[in-house]
Amino acid sequence: MDDVERIQSENENLRKIRNRLMQWESKTDPLAALSIQQEEHLDVLTNLWRDSGPSAPAPTTPTQVGPTDSSAAATSQSGDDIRLPAEGLQNTNEFLLWFADVSAEIEQRGDADYHKYLQQLEQRKAECSHMLDQIAGAMERLGALCDEYDFVSQKTSALNTASEQLIEEQERLQELSHEIQRRLHYFSQVELLNQRLQSPTLSVASEAFRECLNKIDECLNYIEENPKFKDAAAYNVKYRQCLAKASGLVRNYVTSVINQATEATLHPKNNMPDASAALKAPDAAFALYYGKYQTAAAKVKRVAQLIESRSEHSLDYAQLMADLQQHYLAQRASVMSPAVNLSIQNVKVAHKGDHCSLTRSACAFLVHVCQDEQRLFYQFFSTGAPHLTVYLEGLCTILYDTMRPFIIHINHLETLAEICSILRIEMLEEHVQQNPVALEAFATIAHQLLQDVQERLVFRAHLYLQSDIQNFNPSSGDLAYPEKLEMMESIALSLQEPAPLRRSDSRNSMVSSVSSAVETESVATAYTVKQMNSPADLHGMWYPTVRRTLVCLSRLYRCVDRPIFQGLSQEALKLCIQSVSHAAGKISANKTPIDGELFEIKHLLILREQIAPFRVDFTVKETSLDFSKVKTAAFGLLQKRKQLFSMGSNNALLEFLLEGTPQIKEHLLDSRKEVDRQLKSVCEKYIKDAVQMLVGPLITFLEKAQSLLAQSTPATPQSPESTKASYVLRQSPWASPQQISSIIQETQRLIKAKLAVLQRSMQLYLSNRDTEFIIFRPIRNNIIQSFVKLEQLLTTNGYSTDDMIITSCPSAEQVSILLSSASILAAEGVASFAAAARKISTSSSVEGSTVGRKLSAMSNKSELVEEPKVEEVAGQIEVVPAEVQPPAKIEEEEVTETQTQANSE
């Protein structure tokens, strides 16, 4: 029973083991899942077992062992092998023995698989032990191999280190060798370069020559940078010799090419035109003087670039470049100097006597020559502007040498001014400013020539001012005032009258009507132009010295520098004022003082108006020495003779040096203010003479009465005779009311008779209503004031009411009405002339019209009008700009001027 239970329990255990083994490899939820690598190892072991031989027992996996299979095998085997003995069982003992044998056999058969598995395990154990022994042996051999590897590695590392050291040493030695070879290269090229430079086949324009120059420069620079090397000085000399040979080759080549071009230009072949014939044709001249050189420029340019690229870093190349340029310019000078000289001589012959055309043509020719020469020069070289400028200045000096003898003998200011304009405007401002680099030399010579012309112009202007202004002797026609103005005014009036209209002879002729319309329009246009200026303002009616002064200043203004013009204008205006004053004196002596003064006022106004457009300051600073203190210091020195050598602070000589120093004084002379001062003086004199002419008897009476009253007035106002002093004038026979009445009547008669003449003269000379009103206002006020003084004098000196009635002394209002009525009568008397003047005058100032309106309103007032100052009158007098010629248009008038020849040269 125990065996059966034991067997059952074993079977049960086997069943559990089988179930667990099945769960280990279950596809759904395995207890011990094998990885892919483990399965591969298992397959490898299986294959090894299969390959080991048929004697080896087949492996039995736990999954193949089970109780059902074991029992089935045991049953089948027990059915076959376990049999009863043939004799049978005789007794119980035999049965028990048999049963024991059967049980042992069953038990043995039941454990057969386990025994086989145990054998396999033992076999595997033996194999593993054997494998472990092999692994141990392999590990021993591997350890030995590692030891040997470490030994070899140490040896190899040492060998590698030694090899690297040797390689580094080899590289260092190679670098040292290369460095030595590189440095020796700069010393070993001397012979090779000498051989190349001495080769007869070497061409300067070839690439081999360029390489030679590069090597020479490289070696020279290296040796100069390392002067401490052995034999550096000797090799420097050798390379310098090579450079000298190369420079000689370049110099010979370039000079040969340039000389050939020069020879071909100066001595052309028979089929080429000669120089004299070529100068007459510009294209032929250009081909002759520039064709050969332009052909040679291509050969020289490449070689010149070799030198120019090195000239900035080497003085030898710079000197060689300068020599080549000097040779080129010398050859060009030998070609162009005679040609330029001949051309200028031809121009001089062609424009003989016409200095302006000669200057313009000669300068234009030199401008083209300078531009062509500059263009040709830069076809050969890229640098060298200073040498080119010197060469071009030499060519332009021919122009200067040709023109200067003419300039220093020109006497006419017009010619000198025109030459100045040509040089300054046409040449310097137009041509030179457009191309300043090419025309630098021409600008220098033109500026020198301009300075000579300006110097001559200033000199001739001084002589002109002295001869034609200061020493001007006017003729009777120059002083025929106011006859000249009256004649011109009559001509203006005759032109003002419109011609009677007439019908055309043929109404059907369109040509005749059109031509008549055109003719009428042209006549109207001419008449309009002629009536723009009044007779007194016409340029031809100016006094010759005024006209000449303004013409001279207008020419000098555009020709000379501003400081020079200021000095000349100061002198010219001063002489012009003196000349006008002298002419006014002669007119006053021949005609009346009024004519002379109006003549001077008009021309001073013209002079002031014409110098206004000049944008210069007419102020000139004059410096002088004041020696007034020198005399005082000298007297002090003589009085202190004993203190001449005194060692103290009272040394007489020291005081003389300190106190006797001349003082420098500066005086500012303003020509504009000088004109204003002269105008003020003349206006004052004219106002005085006009008042004297209109109310002369009244002024004489007032002066005589004032003198009498001044003599009879006591020294002290408290004197008892002071009350009788007021009757002294009344008791004088010449101051009786009847005499005063006759004086007043005579004065009124003079006003009525001469006021029209006075205003007529003002209108004739001044030709400007505003100016006439401004000048007439103080005359009017002085006349009114004279009558007011007379009335005050009669009132305060014992004249009774009956005496006042007898004298018929008018009041200020009555005098104003009298002057206004006389002015109206005068205006009616000269209505035609005033209308002509108003139509001839083109414009008037707003300020002047305002003043005129004030004067008209003033005439209706009975109050005494304050007398305006003469300075205000002179400041208010203005000439309408449209009535006078501007300085720019003065030269356009055809004015005949007489110029005397000066012998000061």
From Swiss-Prot:
Organism of origin: Drosophila melanogaster (Fruit fly)
Family that this chain belongs to: Belongs to the COG3 family.
Cellular component GO terms, alphabetical: cis-Golgi network; Golgi membrane; Golgi transport complex
Disordered: annotated span: 49-78, 884-905
Gene Ontology BP, a term: intra-Golgi vesicle-mediated transport
Name assigned to this protein: Conserved oligomeric Golgi complex subunit 3
Membrane topology reported for the UniProt record: Peripheral membrane protein
UniProt keyword Membrane present: yes
Cross-referenced PANTHER family: CONSERVED OLIGOMERIC GOLGI COMPLEX COMPONENT 3, CONSERVED OLIGOMERIC GOLGI COMPLEX SUBUNIT 3
Bias type Polar residues, positions: 64-78
